[in-house]
């Protein structure tokens, strides 16, 4: 396995919506490196989880502005990926969530 694959996928996004999408449409959600492209994300998911990826959709999320005392600060920007896997395949990491 390539070490670069682990740098591309930062963490899984587990929300109520992502759990529903996983169960109904075989879609997995990840927070990924902001510089990663769809091809790199697809290869990383296939290498790490041993599944066949059909589609990858990415979205850039701008960080929110938050107030700290009398000053404003900004949270970090991030990138999310929605990965569709082949029907019938499962990722054990996400089972039971």
From Swiss-Prot:
Domain of life: Bacteria
GO biological process, one term: translation
GO molecular function, one term: structural constituent of ribosome
Gene3D superfamilies, per database record: 3.30.70.330
Gene Ontology CC, one term: ribonucleoprotein complex
Matching Pfam families: Ribosomal_L23 (PF00276)
InterPro entries from the UniProt entry: Nucleotide-bd_a/b_plait_sf, Ribosomal_uL23-like, Ribosomal_uL23/eL15/eS24_sf
Record keywords: Ribonucleoprotein, Ribosomal protein, RNA-binding, rRNA-binding
The family this protein is said to belong to: Belongs to the universal ribosomal protein uL23 family.
Biological role stated in the UniProt entry: One of the early assembly proteins it binds 23S rRNA. One of the proteins that surrounds the polypeptide exit tunnel on the outside of the ribosome. Forms the main docking site for trigger factor binding to the ribosome.
Assembly: Part of the 50S ribosomal subunit. Contacts protein L29, and trigger factor when it is bound to the ribosome.
This protein's name: Large ribosomal subunit protein uL23
Organism: Syntrophobacter fumaroxidans (strain DSM 10017 / MPOB)
């Amino acid at each position: 396995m390539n070490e670069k694959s682990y740098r591309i996928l930062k963490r899984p996004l587990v929300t109520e919506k992502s759990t529903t999408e996983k169960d109904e449409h075989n879609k997995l959600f990840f927070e990924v490196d902001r510089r990663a492209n769809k091809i790199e994300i697809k290869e990383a998911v296939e290498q790490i989880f041993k599944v066949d990826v059909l589609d990858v959709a990415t979205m850039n999320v701008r960080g929110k502005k938050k107030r700290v005392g009398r000053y404003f600060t900004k949270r970090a920007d991030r990138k999310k990926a929605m990965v569709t896997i082949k029907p019938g395949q499962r990722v054990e990491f996400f089972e039971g969530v």
